[in-house]
Amino acid sequence: MTTTDTTIQHRTAEPPTPQQKRTTFIALMIVFLLSALDMTIISTAMPRIVADLHGLEIYAWVTTVYLLTSTVMVPIWGKLGDMYGRKLILILGISIFVGGSWLCGLAGEFGDLPILGSGMIQLIVFRGIQGIGGGALFTSAFATIADLFEPRERAKYAGLFGAVFGLASVLGPVIGGFFTDHGTVEIFGT
């Protein structure tokens, strides 16, 4: 059995200034908020989505597949972040997340597709893609906090992430309900 060295190779550059730390933290909170909103916004939109895409018997998978794929990807994204850097993984995660959101908005627009089937199956597959990106967002955010701040400061910043998630839990269903009144596609940003 071999062990791997998971220590992060820091560049010889100067450590980030307090202003750079604040800016980075605010950007991470925005990313975290969008990912957390995505988990909660869909709950109030599901009745409309099911009516549009006709998949009552499998509607629970729309939420489940996102949570499943994002959770499974956490250790993978974490290791990749250790190997290739947090910024690269965060940008890759944002790209996958946004691409998955765009695809979710298109689910069912082209009828039954040979590999992806009906609109509801398409939505489930695309939510899985979105979850893969979402896992990178959560992982990169918490790992970057560990990189930026001393151990005694980390709990405070992790707690602020918890507050952002609480805010998303309250705002998500409200925003989802608002967008549902204007059509289901808008919750995915298309």
Q: Where do the protein language model's features map onto the residues?
A:
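Transmembrane-helix bundle of Major Facilitator Superfamily
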Residues: 2, 8-190
